[in-house]
Structures are given as C-alpha cells and as structure tokens.
Amino acid sequence: MATTILPLILFISSLAIASSSPSRTPHAIVNEVHKSINASRRNLGYLSCGTGNPIDDCWRCDPNWANNRQRLADCAIGFGKNAMGGRNGRIYVVTDPGNDDPVNPVPGTLRYAVIQDEPLWIIFKRDMVIQLRQELVMNSHKTIDGRGVNVHIGNGPCITIHYASNIIIHGIHIHDCKQAGNGNIRNSPHHSGWWTQSDGDGISIFASKDIWIDHNSLSNCHDGLIDAIHGSTAITISNNYMTHHDKVMLLGHSDSYTQDKNMQVTIAFNHFGEGLVQRMPRCRHGYFHVVNNDYTHWEMYAIGGSASPTIYSQGNRFLAPNTRFDKEVTKHENAPESEWKNWNWRSEGDLMLNGAYFRESGGRAASSFARASSLSGRPSTLVASMTRSAGALVCRKGSRC
C-alpha cells in the first residue's frame, strides 16, 4: 500500500473520515436492508427481475437505467449500504483514455474526475482501455460507472481509495495491475504529494469507509485483487467475478494492527472462479459476512484468517478441488489450535460439494455472530441463479441490463 506525506492538519482531519467505529446494530442494518429491498420492488413494479439477487432485482430490469443511473445508489446492501458515491452530483463523462498525468490531470480523463472535491457520477463516452502511470487515488463521493461500455483498467497501477468515503465502483474490468509509486500523485485539486511504492492491488482500500465494489471483473494483479486495511470499514463487495489470481482478498492490515477490530465487510453474490488460489477472503480482527457466493475453484483454501476475526459464512456454494488435501474451505492461520478454536467461525446453510468441508470454531450462540450479520442470506440452492451474472455486465441503452 502506498503512503503519502500529508500536512499534519490534513492527516488529522482525515481521521474523522476513516473512523473504524462499528456500524449501527446488525438488527437495524438487516431491517433497513429489508425495507430497501421492498421499496425497490415497489418502485420497479413489474420490472423486477426476480433473480433472488436483491441488488440486481433492484435495478437491472429497468430499460431506462441509462437515464436514471444514480438510482443504483439505492440498491446497495450489507455493511456498505450507505455508500452513496457521487449521488446528487453531476454526471461527468470520461472522453480521454490516455494523457494520464498523475500531478496535473487533463480534463476529460478518469484521473481528473476522481480527484475533484465535489460529488461526481463518472461514466464513459465509449469503450476504453486505461493504462495508468501511477495509482488512481480517489477523492470522496465518487461513482465510477462502466455500464453501457467496455472499460478496462490494467497493465499498470490501478485504483486506490485512501482516507476517503462514499465510493462506488461498478461495471469495469480491472486486471494485470502492477506496482508503481516513488513519485508525486495528485489526490485533490489542491493537494499532491509523494507516494511510496504501491503493492499492485486491483483496488486498495486504506483507512476508508462506506465503500461499495459491485459487478466488476478482476484478475491477475501483482498483490491482491481487493485489499482493505488500516481501519477501513462499512464495505460491501458484491457481484464481482474474480479469476486467475493467487492472493485474492485481504481484509485487515496485520495481526498487530488492532484498529481493524471494528472492520465490518459484506462479501455477497460474488463468483470466485478459475485460477484462484487462496484468500477469498483472508480476514483479521473484524467482522465478516460471507453470504451467497459461488466458490467454483481454489487451490489452497477459500476462507482464512488470523488474529481472531469473526467470520459468518452463510448460504454459499463451495465446490472443492479434486486434490485430496485441499478440500477444506477454511484455514486458521498464525495460531495453534488451542488458540484458534476460540475464534468465532460459523457455517450456516452452506452447500458443500466434492468433499468440501468448513472447520467451524468458537461459540455457537447467535450473539457471537451478531456483529458479522449484515443481511438475510438466501438458500444456497439459489446461488447459481444469484451469481450467474457476476462481473462487469453487458448493458445497452434502452434495454434491460
């Protein structure tokens, strides 16, 4: 993860943005999710898709989606449900996939859009391949919306969310991300600073909150596909298609970084596909709801963690590899069994195929997992239909997406 030299006053003010205090009570969140889903169904009426995926059913069957893009912000669920992105801001159209100047970005480029102070809903004029020279450091209250076009960010450094809030990233391809840094990068119209070498993540979330990563296709990055660290919280990672990668997702900076104890992340309706090895996710300290995902490939393990994270696995489908000694879904790391047996890891309603098994630990009482519950999971038998369209969608104006 890159770091930047900031004035002390900017650093202090940013701590308020990245507070890692936990979200409201899980019961309140679940009630709000149900209210939001029901309201969305009423608003769509006969347009509702009926896939069982509450995010997709909220917006995808509206043929007028291109003229009502910001309605997407009503459809988030889970711990990141309050991520508004650039809602109520201007629509900003990216017209130039090149000219990536990290310090003085050119109007019309993606970098120029994401550093602005005002809320912006960012869309793209046409299909684009964007190869960045340095990390794309996002300012708060931004949506990157790739619907209706084919947008790739890759073959260079990729996306960083650093001391920011209210970010939505939707509908783009992120792949072949590389390390960069040791140079100046602008992160607002009024500030640029020196950034050290980045890790080469697809999306790096650092000390940020109210983040929603939805319907993206991610693969083959230098480090993680999506990493969230340093007190980041209130995050939903949903409907993404991930392939061809080793260390897929890290949630929590290190075993010694206790500020991640209040991290809350929802991982829902994703497809973990071919060529994946481990960390789907790898968790530390916080509270993680892994719900209604499709795990069709892993080489080492699917869900792991250390430093006593609370992991609630609900309604997922796990298809184990054919190799005899890699069928365990879980991996308790950096601790003897005498210690990890007390970590709260629970499997509820998961479908285990080809010999897959989940090694539970800790308490069985519902209260042990209350802070890791973020929505009402659906039966695992519905996972195939709920995740069938995971990844960046092919959407055409005037038609259902």
Swiss-Prot record:
Its tissue distribution reads: Expressed in sites of vascular differentiation and in new primordia on the flank of the shoot meristem.
Residues annotated as glycosylated: 38
Superkingdom assignment: Eukaryota
Q: Which GO terms describe its biological process?
A: pectin catabolic process
- Look at the named UniProt entry and state the broad enzyme category this protein falls under: lyase
State the reactions this protein catalyses. Answer: Eliminative cleavage of (1->4)-alpha-D-galacturonan to give oligosaccharides with 4-deoxy-alpha-D-galact-4-enuronosyl groups at their non-reducing ends
Cofactors required: Ca(2+)
The record's GO molecular-function terms, alphabetically, read: metal ion binding; pectate lyase activity
| UniProt keyword annotations, A-Z | Calcium, Glycoprotein, Lyase, Metal-binding, Signal
> What factors induce this protein?
Up-regulated by auxin.
Tell me how the cofactor is bound. Answer: Binds 1 Ca(2+) ion. Required for its activity.
User: What does UniProt give as the signal peptide span?
Assistant: 1-20
Q: In which pathway does it act?
A: Glycan metabolism; pectin degradation; 2-dehydro-3-deoxy-D-gluconate from pectin: step 2/5
Q: Which EC number(s) does the record attach to this protein?
A: 4.2.2.2
Entry annotation: catalytic residues: 279
* pH dependence, record text: Optimum pH is 10.
The entry's Ca(2+)-binding residues are 199, 223, 227
Task: Summarize the protein's role.
Answer: Involved in the degradation of pectin. May assist in the removal and modification of an existing pectin matrix in order to allow the deposition of newly synthesized walls polymers for a specialized function or to create an architecture that is extensible.
Report the sequence similarity comment from the record: Belongs to the polysaccharide lyase 1 family.
What is the protein name stated in its UniProt record? Answer: Pectate lyase
